Regions:
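N-terminal helicase ATP-binding lobe
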Residues: 1-300
Length: 300
């Protein structure tokens, strides 16, 4: 199929540009870049609808990641100047949302690092950026006064952990989509993506993960500490450690995690939980690297 070849070629093109390969051969998708982008968005819509119906599957995840390889050409530094007619920030938001849905939350947050939320006129885009960045991208207006209902719903859930607010926001977005209450085609796509991200966020957030471990424990101070670090959910490796009983150990445990998998953060959680439950206990934390010990000293 022609579009399958275009997506494969777009991956090759991105690789060549990223590694400075000279004399990149002519590729058909680049000569038809407007049609290619329209196809990508149409394909995106189709996959998102399937995701809402069936949830994440291996096939959907693969299709989404292939799609991200095509979309990112229109935004990343090495390639975006070769394309035209696409809002770079909004396109980055599509790509970041895909990585978020596929559990690559660190990548999705990194892509949003230099984004100014004021670039997004649409409420759906702003809320997406806020959730995906862990609050790193936020409106300058801090109070609830005069804020839209959707912002209030999302923030109250994040700050207070009451699921009724997130459920209400999911209902608001579902109703908007059902009634086709959109200001533009971009609003249509962003609202669809937001519906998917909200469902993912409902399943994967700090409040839900921590309460599953100990529903009677007061997690509010730890969630507040995490928000200051722009963390709204655990990384997959961290969640896996929790699911395997990290906080329920009796005498000792061995924590094996890849580099940059969030060991320091998950250790903070362990220390917090132990000392809250056993304030008379003492903890010896050996930091093997000087940089890590300095980081711990700065944070605590």
């Amino acid at each position: 199929m022609k579009f399958d070849k275009w997506i494969n070629d777009s991956e090759k093109y991105e690789f060549c540009k990223s590694y400075g390969v000279a004399n990149i051969p002519s590729m058909e998708f680049k000569e038809h870049q407007e049609n290619f982008y329209i196809y990508l968005l149409s394909y995106f819509h189709e996959i998102m609808e399937t995701y809402l119906e069936k949830g994440m599957t291996d096939d959907i995840k693969k299709e989404l990641l292939d799609l991200a390889d095509g979309l990112i050409l229109y935004s990343q530094n090495e390639t975006y100047e070769d394309f035209y007619g696409v809002n770079r920030g909004q396109n980055f938001l599509y790509v970041s949302s895909i990585y978020y849905l596929c559990d690559y939350t660190a990548i999705s947050s990194l892509l949003m690092h230099d984004i100014d939320i004021e670039e997004f006129p649409l409420e759906a885009s702003q809320i997406l950026a806020f959730i995906i960045s862990g609050g790193g991208v936020e409106k300058r207006q801090k109070s609830y006064d005069n804020e839209e209902v959707s912002w209030i719903n999302v923030k109250k859930f994040i700050y207070q952990g009451e699921e009724i607010y997130l459920d209400e926001e999911i209902s608001v977005q579902d109703r908007k989509y059902k009634e086709r209450d959109f200001d533009s085609s971009t609003d249509f796509y962003m609202s669809l993506v937001l519906r998917c991200v909200l469902r993912k966020f409902k399943e994967n957030n700090l409040w839900t993960s921590l309460r599953a471990i100990d529903p009677d424990f007061d997690w509010s101070s730890y969630v507040r500490h995490s928000r200051r670090q722009h963390i709204f959910s655990f990384l997959p490796s961290q969640q896996d450690a929790l699911n395997k009983g990290l906080l329920n150990f009796q005498r000792a445990f061995s924590l094996k995690m890849p580099t940059s998998a969030g060991k320091s953060y998950i250790t903070e959680l362990l220390i917090h939980y132990v000392l809250k439950n056993h304030p008379e206990d003492r903890i010896l934390y050996l930091a093997p690297l000087r940089a890590l010990s300095r980081e711990l000293k700065d944070h605590h």
